[in-house]
Regions:
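Positively charged n-region of N-terminal signal peptides that target proteins for export
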Residues: 1-8
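Repetitive helical segments and hydrophobic/amphipathic motifs
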Residues: 11-13
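C-terminal motif of bacterial Sec signal peptides marking the signal peptidase cleavage site
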Residues: 17-21
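Exported/periplasmic ABC-transporter solute-binding proteins
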Residues: 23-33, 40, 47, 53-55, ...
Length: 313
């Protein structure tokens, strides 16, 4: 009997051992898939790590600086444009140290002839181009507007003159200041030499072309200013920007030669300052193009105003 009980207990123990072993095996097998399932999760996280990487943007390539200009630029012509040309060329050469600008003041006609002959790059004229000059290939580039001032010797008592009387003075039909309300004093008529842009513009605007009777014909704006200042009874015409306190400026028909009056079209004696080229600006070399670009820049406009001229509208 005792042997049967022992045998039964041994059997129960063996069954329990077998069941425990099976349970452990199943537990191990069940844990394995969890590990395998974790792997894809790690793999799925990888793209997030890649997306989180900082994006390095490429910097835009730096613009290449404009090529430095080297060479010469030759201008010639109007003496009235001296102040403008001197100020503009000095500033331009400071901005472009590789360029040398030369200017000869020979008068508008001579400057345009030199341009047509190909001996200069730009012909300066203080008047509009004539048809014959345009037919030679010269192109009119207006860079500024100038007023022509009528001046008299400082002791003169006349301060205003009509356009009609002014024309008569230059044609010799009025020869004494008393006929204009002034003192009994002969009028000494001073003007520019033939070929001068100032003379051409004055005579054309006053409609006295080839009809003037001059006491003296001088070859520069400065010479006219000095002669009128030192000659009792003298009258002359000069570029507005050179008028100083050595002379008096006359009103014409009651209108003073100011920028406002000129732009409004009220002042009769105004003319363009032209820098003519052979062909259009688009056909010029790089230095000539740079010169005109500079004139049209804010710096160039300030220079135009500083020398007493008006920027074209």
């Amino acid at each position: 009997m005792r042997k049967k009980v022992v045998a039964a207990l041994m059997a129960v123990t063996m069954v329990a051992a077998l069941l425990t072993g099976c349970g452990a095996s199943e537990t191990k097998q069940a844990a394995a898939p969890a590990t395998e399932e974790a792997a894809p999760a790690a793999e799925e996280a990888a793209p997030e790590a890649e997306e989180a990487a900082p994006v390095v943007e490429e910097e835009p390539a730096a613009e290449e600086p404009a090529p430095e200009l080297n060479g010469t630029l030759a201008l010639g012509g109007s003496t009235s444009m001296e102040k403008l040309c001197e100020a503009m060329s000095e500033s331009f050469m400071e901005a472009n140290p590789g360029v040398t600008v030369t200017v000869e003041y020979t008068g508008s006609g001579a400057g345009l002839e030199a341009l047509a002959a190909g001996s200069i790059d730009i012909g300066n004229a203080s008047r509009k181009l004539k048809d014959a000059e345009k037919e030679n290939g010269s192109v009119e580039n207006i860079v500024a507007i100038d007023g022509i001032a009528v001046i008299a010797e400082k002791s003169n008592t006349v301060t205003d003159i009509s356009a009609e009387d002014l024309a008569k003075v230059y044609k010799g039909e009025i020869s004494n200041w008393k006929d204009l309300g002034g003192d009994d004093q002969p009028i000494v008529v001073i003007g520019r030499e033939a070929g001068s842009g100032t003379r051409d513009a004055f005579e054309e605007l006053m409609e006295v072309k080839d009809a003037c009777v001059y006491a003296q014909e001088l070859d520069s704006t400065g010479a006219v200013l000095a002669k009128v200042a030192s000659t009792p009874g003298a009258i002359g015409y000069v570029s507005l920007d050179v008028v100083d306190d050595t002379v008096i400026g006359l009103k014409i028909d009651g209108v003073e030669p100011t920028e406002e009056q000129i732009l409004a079209g009220n002042y009769v004696l105004q003319r363009p300052f032209v820098m003519a080229t052979t062909g259009e600006l688009s056909e010029q070399n790089e230095i000539v193009k740079a010169w005109f670009d500079y004139i049209g820049s804010e710096t160039g406009k300030e220079i135009i105003k500083k020398v007493g001229l008006i920027i074209p509208q």
